[in-house]
């Protein structure tokens, strides 16, 4: 590429890090790292009404958890928060006012509402109509004096070139253009409180920080022509733009909504449940991009090497919770036991299950976990007297030979001394029951598994029985025999 790559992630500190914003950050990160460019973070905190205490820290903390790093941010650079840059915005507001490219607007909110209602009744497209239209200089001066005397604080509006065409070649969407006459008239670049509006401030920031490429969600497409107007008014070259497609719910086919309860949507939720950050990073990287081929498990280094902006999808990205859970399970299965056990400790401790067998339990159930917090429901059988059964499990336990199998295996366990009760000696006892009773296959193994664990599927049965313990296993079998005899 001919110019230095400088990209940014610019969140508003208005809450937790959402999966959509995390994707924006991640794609900018991958793009910068792939091309040897600069990835920076800027905080857009001019919307004071939506400002959340600790929102900035939460954003940065969760990005770090995902495994991202950055080259510039408010932590290392001054004036990387918009609230620290008000003097800079004012400088360019004053310049545009002096050049006649912007003007002070004294229209009240009540007048704007009334005009919108009139336009609606008349079937007109809603738009702001310049309040000075048709006024002479004397009338304009008198109008301003009257409004200021009434204590009305003005906004500042950009004078829109309604005959202008604002177009760009989008990195994802291809050629896009808007007519200046279709964006709603002259728009506010500075609010009454002196703060700039988003579409003005972001241009000043991106130019000042020499941003080369703006990669963001396609909900920003409608903002782009307004931003191009500011670039034009100030005589600056605009960066390249790329607008990623929406993330949709794979079950509903609609835009992912914070009201969708079937998906976890905030990075904090994944942290709390014990997902591995590498798994979440991998999953998000494939939301609207793929490197080609059938492989889906990639390390961060592989994703950086493979990332190609030309493969950003033009179709909506489906958020599939089941796919994420499959991917997470793959990462947990392949992680070392020490890592997963350390992650599991807080869950085990809170449940009162951090016993001397805890690490063995984690090792036993690690291949089944989609998130580490699942260690609690997975190990319920070790801390209860009688496991609850599903209808399918109850049906198995109504089999004619079930009592025979359970009585025979209980007798084998009772006959084992403590020093003989080890994992490798348990399977031979099950085979001995087969030899004595002539019962084999599912009719042999399934009743024992369900009686001991309350599950039709799970880890190796001898491992489960050993960790449950001889006495507890016998107790579970006795409880099951009582249950099926009712």
Swiss-Prot record:
'HIGH' region, short sequence motif: residues: 11-21
Location within or outside the cell: Cytoplasm
EC number: 6.1.1.17
Coiled-coil segments on the chain, per record: none
Residues spanned by motif 'KMSKS' region: 255-259
Enzyme class, broadest EC rank: ligase
Chief place where the protein resides: cytoplasm
Reactions performed catalytically: tRNA(Glu) + L-glutamate + ATP = L-glutamyl-tRNA(Glu) + AMP + diphosphate
GO biological process: glutamyl-tRNA aminoacylation
Binding site for ATP: 258
CDD domains per the UniProt record, alphabetical: GluRS_core
GO molecular function, one term: ATP binding
Record keyword Aminoacyl-tRNA synthetase present: yes
Gene Ontology CC terms: cytosol
Keywords tagged on the record: Aminoacyl-tRNA synthetase, ATP-binding, Cytoplasm, Ligase, Nucleotide-binding, Protein biosynthesis
Entry keyword annotation includes Ligase: yes
Function statement: Catalyzes the attachment of glutamate to tRNA(Glu) in a two-step reaction: glutamate is first activated by ATP to form Glu-AMP and then transferred to the acceptor end of tRNA(Glu).
Subunit structure: Monomer.
Family under the similarity heading: Belongs to the class-I aminoacyl-tRNA synthetase family. Glutamate--tRNA ligase type 1 subfamily.
Protein name (record): Glutamate--tRNA ligase
